[in-house]
Amino acid sequence: MPKVSSDTLWDIAAAEVRSRESRTDEEEAEEEDAHFPSQRTVFFMGSKAGGKTTILLRFLERDETAKPTLALEYTFGRRARGHNTPKDIAHLWELGGGISLSDLVQIPITADNVSFLSVVLVLDLSKPNALWETMESLLGSARNQVEKVCAALQKTGESRSGKQRVPRVLHKDYPDRELISPFPVPLLIVGSKFDIFQDFDSEKRKVICKTLRFLAHFYGASLIFTSSKSETTMSKSRSFINQLAFGTERPKSISTDPSKPLAIPAGSDSLSQIGPPVATEVDIGTLHAKNPFDLWKKVFEKVFPHESTRERKELKDPVKDPQFSEPLIDSIRAQKDQELDQYKREQAKSWKSLALDP
């Protein structure tokens, strides 16, 4: 005799609510868009000359030589889910110049795409002294822009039919949910140039690894280390970016060994697994930290003192950059520069020739 379910309609509804509460916004998005083409935006930013363009080209499987990104560049990728199906589109933005051009975040982060937006932060592991400032400055600028856009939408009463709630809400079982401050949109932190990083002193590697694990967990982000010289790590990074760009299945492999490239999907780590900051060179008791985030920052910058790079001054003059050469325009510009120099010399001579009476 078949078993008859004793669940009432109320029991079934309650179970459905519990099921939905346990899912992340990204998982809900994947279910909602399973049968419809999507358009998502992925915003790449990070360390100057940190390998963002290389990672982006590898993701798009383009056999091109990476060129320095002058300011802000746009491209796109498409992916078919099956035979004779509309292709999903990923709008891909890349911010160049490190922290010097952070004001440009307002261009790729708009009311039209904020509900479909995710961020990839690329940090150069070979330059740990600039790592914290780069992370804090760029994520701060991006967060402020997202919050500004969301506030404007709420003020005008507009509603966007998006896949994810913004700011996103972590499910109730997310590790340490009450102790972290999740980034308002999905975030992937990529540690680049692992091939150089792996030659660092083991204690310094441990400090960097634990700190980035804490930061990724604090922001509710995924974390992966990669190297352009390792196809294995580049393939893993593609999987993480694919999930953001096209809603593919979340990578499940986890690696927390500091001697190997880290790979930690969001929600797979916890404060208890990460442990306290590495303090072999620091007496934590002497540090006056306001909160755990501030403590990790103080410990990290004791080991890797902040170096002011003045990136704004380091930016190359695009007029002299061969990447943007225009022979005809450049020759006219050179002629005008010569005329200006000659005019300045003549004016200087005329002032010197003046006999000014006392």
UniProtKB/Swiss-Prot annotation:
Gene Ontology MF term list: dynein heavy chain binding
Lineage top rank: taxon: Eukaryota
Annotated region (Disordered), positions in chain: 1-35, 307-358
GO terms under cellular component: axoneme; centrosome; ciliary basal body; cytoplasmic dynein complex; microtubule; non-motile cilium
Designated name of the protein: Cytoplasmic dynein 2 light intermediate chain 1
Record-linked SUPFAM superfamilies: P-loop containing nucleoside triphosphate hydrolases
Keyword terms: Cell projection, Cilium, Cilium biogenesis/degradation, Cytoplasm, Cytoskeleton, Developmental protein, Dynein, Microtubule, Motor protein
Pfam family, one: DLIC
Transmembrane segment boundaries: none
